[in-house]
Amino acid sequence: LRKLKLQLLKLKISTKIFWIVVTVFIISVCREPLFFLHPRIWAEEGVIHINSVLTNGLWGSLISPHLGYYSLFNNYVTSIGMKFFGLLGIAYVTTWMSFLVILLTVLSPLVLKSKFWDSDAKKITLILFLLIGGSAEIWLNTVNSQFYFCLFTALVFLSEPIEFNGWKWIYILFMMVNAVMTGITSAALAPFFIYKYLKSSTKSSKENFLVALLIFGACVQIYSLIYLKISSDISRFDISNIVNFPNGFYRNIVGILIFPGWVIHAILVLLIPIFLLNKEVRAVENSLPLIIAIYLSALFAFLSLGMHGGRRYSYPSSGLTFIFLLNLLSLKKVNTFTHLSTYIFLLIILYGAALRYFETKDVYDPEWKKFTLSNISELPENKLMLEVFPQWPNTNWAIIFSKEDLDKFKK
């Protein structure tokens, strides 16, 4: 009888997870079906990574750092995609691989255990925000997958010690290896993992591996930065842009408030200090998501183009701030005002995110030229050009290649 009850319980849990996954998939497709029906190549995916394959070859492009950091995920997805699917199918590869990263990040609360999402209601609420809280700019492109990787890494940090085996460990391992080797966003969390590791009284082999992996990833990214800084000019690290840093930091930290307008921003800036006056809220174990959010907001403002920050840089911080607010509802020594304010804020945040979720025309305009071989145009000196997204006025995102390249990668 006990075995039967356990089997029924497992079946119930599996059914619940199945419907959550199906719902997430449906909401994702409904955002803009054209992302899946007519995939596009986004900006640096074409200009940097596909051009790198054309210039350096499949293997050479795998080890090439770009734009100040090494990006394993972008490199191997583009290289493998070009090898087996060519120019005709590469957009499908980058789109679906990016979608896989989004799904594995958004659904991670179902696998990772943490006091910050220790109930079904918390898990579902968090999954919903992680899905609809990402701006359209970071949606379904490998270039911005680093921000999903960063949030996943933060969720691993906030979870209980890793004791998984089998597919769960493979899942975490796949995401973490890609995360620390794809941009600086995840490797930047290495100090937090080291701090947690040193404080832990029991250290498992998996925790040892994750800390070593993050340190290795940080070293790779620092080396890539130094190498590119010496060999080329990286304008994004121009210290003269420091005058933009305060505004960039502000844009990143209030990115969770999708609503425009200074009023809501001001309310959040005023309320969080009020929340922190409570001793239980102020405790490190409860305020940790907010601490990491502030750290990432500052770091990403410094590393962003012109230090202006922006919505794509705010996604990890927004997810962490949402977790901080969600956790306030579980604290017992918090007054009624804080609880009520938190409920209202969470509803405002979810409502605002839902409104913005379907605003995708700025990154996918149906009138823009599709990424198809029929839209290739000829240039002088036997060169060919294929435009990629975005096709905003006064921009020229395009892949330039030779007819020999077309013959080689035309599948």
Feature annotation, model-predicted:
Residues R2-S135, F164-K168, Y195, S205-I215, ...:
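Intrinsically disordered, polar/acidic, low-complexity terminal segments
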Residues S231-N241:
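Low-complexity repetitive segments in secreted/extracellular proteins
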Residues S71, S98-P161, M181-T182, W262-I264, ...:
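Membrane-interface micro-motifs in multi-pass membrane enzymes
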Residues K168-F193:
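Membrane-interface alpha helices of multi-pass inner-membrane proteins
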Residues V220-I230, A301-F302, L355-E359:
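C-terminal TM-helix exit segments that contain a strictly Trp-centered aromatic cap at the helix terminus
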Residues L34-F36, S135-L140, T185-A190, S224-S231, ...:
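Short catalytic/ligand-binding loop motif for oxyanion handling, primarily in non-cytosolic enzymes
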